[in-house]
Amino acid sequence: DLPLTDHCPGYPSLAKFLANAVRDATYDSLATPRLHPVKFIEVMGRDAGWVAAACALGFSDSERDLLPLIFMPEQPPANAEAALAEISDRVNRDGFCVCVIPETLRDSPGRHFGGDEPLSIDAFGHPYFPSAAAAMTRLVQEKLKLRARYERPGTAARMSVSLASSVDQEEAYGLGWAAAARAATGASDIMVTLDRVSDAPYQCAIGTAPLSQIANRVRPFPNGFATTDGRGITDSFRAYALPLLGEQPFPDYARVDFSRIV
């Protein structure tokens, strides 16, 4: 979510990991919806929906009916009751709900679902709050009387080398080389960046930007990348993000058409 760059190194691999994990979690719920009708997946991202949005990338056109319910930080639910109503509607419609939430899920007034007392504060002044997914799981069990569970991939999502994007690996090497070359010439107070040249075929060029315009700033998830209700992604985001994941990032899954079984 850094400004002045198309994306950050590491994001493509994180996106690939989470897109696969959420798709797998959805097929698990599809197979056994009564085991846990509600499943929360808590992901990194305090104020911007880049990571949460990536969780919906693994679903093909024929799987659009399986898309997860995503609560973007930029478009939070009005309150806990509103969030529960959306989850309940999805369960009534599909028999289950896979819900992606940011680690610091808040309601419209800014109250943290996990509690407003931070557990810790990092060197940059970023507070770390109790798990939003744990709090939402309790609410679903208490208010909706449904079985629920939550998953927290945590840092595993950004350090799984076995699922790294080939595009990410190539770009990270190029960025490191470019940064070292500029440092060798005495350049300072800059960050090497990725500048999008084209989507199809995908191409990014390496550039630079002043560090003073990047540090401690956040690039919000664009309105055009999220659906109007803030609970899903648009084809514009798919066109932006899918090329970052490399070739064939998702396995093919078969689905049984139960309507044709006699």
Give the positions of each predicted feature.
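Sparse, context-dependent recognition of short Cys/His-centered cofactor- or disulfide-binding micro-motifs
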Residues: 3, 24-26, 83-85, 177, ...
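C-terminal non-catalytic interaction/assembly regions of soluble proteins
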Residues: 112-262
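Accessory alpha-helical/coil subdomains and C-terminal extensions
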Residues: 8-149
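Surface-exposed loop/turn and secondary-structure junction residues enriched for glycine/proline
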Residues: 5-7, 47, 54, 73-75, ...
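Glycine-rich, charge-decorated loop segments at or immediately adjacent to ligand/cofactor-binding or catalytic sites
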Residues: 1-7, 160
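Short, ordered loop/turn segments at secondary-structure junctions
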Residues: 1-2, 74-76, 103-105, 153-156, ...
